[in-house]
């Protein structure tokens, strides 16, 4: 959030980051205990948990794919992302939402099925970034098929 503020101050233009958008999306959906699916290695997952805890969230569970290279993250099919997110949500029985972290994961196709099958709201890095960029640009149009966040907020 500090980076976004510094960019905005220096340029006079609204700015955001993926993580700022995610935090705002989790808050607007009322998610306090996310179950998190990532493409990352354990050390990156641990840093993500720290940042989210510092932002007031209690991470209900996290599971990563253990991928190192961005190119490999981009090759993950949405069905794999769906399965991982379902598994971490099932394991984290007190989760009140799902967060899929990684801008390289093809997660858009998994959002609606996850929300339907788990009954939990879903936030992904790319979905949150799109949502925040649209709202910052003054676009209020609701988008179907991309989950509760873009459909209702």
Where are these regions (language model features)?
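Non-catalytic structural scaffold of enzyme domains
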Residues: 1-153
């Amino acid at each position: 959030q500090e980076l976004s503020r510094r960019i905005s101050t220096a340029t006079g233009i609204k700015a955001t980051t993926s993580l700022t958008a995610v935090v705002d999306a989790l808050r607007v959906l009322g998610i306090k205990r996310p179950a998190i699916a990532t493409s990352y290695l354990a050390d990156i997952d641990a840093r993500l948990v720290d940042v989210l805890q510092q932002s007031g969230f209690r991470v209900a569970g996290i599971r990563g794919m253990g991928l190192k290279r961005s190119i490999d993250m981009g090759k993950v099919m949405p069905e794999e992302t769906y399965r991982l997110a379902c598994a971490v949500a099932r394991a984290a029985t007190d989760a009140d939402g799902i967060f899929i972290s990684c801008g390289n994961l093809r997660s858009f196709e998994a959002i609606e099925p996850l929300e339907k099958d788990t009954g939990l709201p879903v936030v992904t890095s790319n979905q949150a970034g799109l949502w925040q960029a649209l709202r910052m640009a003054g676009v209020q149009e609701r988008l179907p098929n991309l989950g509760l966040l873009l459909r209702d907020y």
